[in-house]
Amino acid sequence: MSMFGLFTCLSIYFSGVYVFCSKRKHLLVVLLSLEYIVLSLFMLIVLFLVEFDYDYFFPVIFLVFSVCEGALGLSILVSMIRSHGNDFFNSFFLSLC
């Protein structure tokens, strides 16, 4: 595995984790950072599989599950915006009282 590819994947992963931890008030930004993290993990898996000559069925299954995760996140975002008018987590929890 090339060091440049590994460094790129890890820097993308840690920047996604940083955005996920620092901008957690908006659901859309959280979902985008989660997709960013999934993309970096996919790149890391593909680099690992190319390096050791394994078969490529696992990345396809990984992409299917990540697409399902993205679709579920977007459906939660749409239902939250329809019911509350925005994607702030604070307004969502205040209306439960």
From Swiss-Prot:
The chain crosses the membrane at residues 1-21, 28-48, 57-77. It catalyses: a ubiquinone + NADH + 5 H(+)(in) = a ubiquinol + NAD(+) + 4 H(+)(out). The keyword Translocase applies. Pfam families: Oxidored_q2. Its EC number is 7.1.1.2. It is an enzyme of class 7 (translocase). One of its GO terms (biological process) is ATP synthesis coupled electron transport. It is a multi-pass membrane protein. Keywords: Electron transport, Membrane, Mitochondrion, NAD, Respiratory chain, Translocase, Transmembrane, Transmembrane helix, Transport, Ubiquinone. The keyword Transferase does not apply. GO terms for molecular function: NADH dehydrogenase (ubiquinone) activity. Core subunit of the mitochondrial membrane respiratory chain NADH dehydrogenase (Complex I) that is believed to belong to the minimal assembly required for catalysis. Complex I functions in the transfer of electrons from NADH to the respiratory chain. The immediate electron acceptor for the enzyme is believed to be ubiquinone. PANTHER family: NADH-UBIQUINONE OXIDOREDUCTASE CHAIN 4L (PTHR11434:SF0), NADH-UBIQUINONE OXIDOREDUCTASE SUBUNIT ND4L (PTHR11434). Belongs to the complex I subunit 4L family. This is NADH-ubiquinone oxidoreductase chain 4L. It comes from Locusta migratoria.
